[in-house]
Structures are given as structure tokens and as C-alpha cells.
């Protein structure tokens, strides 16, 4: 099975619990089709650079999965049909990084940052 990373943006008018329930729902879809969810992260409500479907903000979620391509295609299809999901990005990776994603790390812990002037 292949390793994937997914980022999903849900509508801003959902509650935090509803946004996290979407992660569980799509994780169950993946599990029903022979895949597994390795890790999920809820990044919270963030402001977007431009409006999507008349929304300026959205609930961002991040999933790391290990699944066959058929399961990922079915999950993406259902995500795109779901009214609460605005955007989905799926990337196939060679290996999952250990620990939290860059978005979840504190600013001081990130590598490669230079001092501000």
C-alpha cells in the first residue's frame, strides 16, 4: 500500500466537533476500502489567502494514511461531493515524517528560520 498525506478545508460555520467528525467519517471510508489512517491533526480555523465559495476562513485538517489507490480515490470522491468540504489536497509520499507536522510545531522549534531584523 502507498503512503499519502491529505489536507482538507471545511466550511467556517462548522463547530470544532463537526470538523473533527469529518476526519473520523472519511477515516472510516478509508478503512472500509482497505486503508488505515496513521495520524490526524486538526489545525483549527485559519484565514485563507482568497475566498473559496464565499468563505474567508476554514477548518483545516491533516491526515496521514496508508491505503491502496482505490480507497484514496473513493475517499477523495466523497470529500468532493460533501457539502461541508471546500478543498482537498492529496499528496503521495515515500515516508511519513515522525512527530507533528510543521503547522503544529511552535515557531521557535522550526528549523531553518533566521533571526528577524
From Swiss-Prot:
Keywords: Ribonucleoprotein, Ribosomal protein, RNA-binding, rRNA-binding. It comes from the Bacteria. GO terms for biological process: translation. GO terms for cellular component: cytosolic small ribosomal subunit. Residues 96-117 are annotated as: Disordered. SUPFAM superfamilies: Ribosomal protein S6. InterPro entries: Ribosomal_bS6, Ribosomal_bS6_sf, Ribosomal_S6_plastid/chlpt, Transl_elong_EF1B/ribsomal_bS6. Pfam families: Ribosomal_S6. One of its GO terms (molecular function) is structural constituent of ribosome. Belongs to the bacterial ribosomal protein bS6 family. Binds together with bS18 to 16S ribosomal RNA. This is Small ribosomal subunit protein bS6. It comes from Jannaschia sp. (strain CCS1). The gene is rpsF.
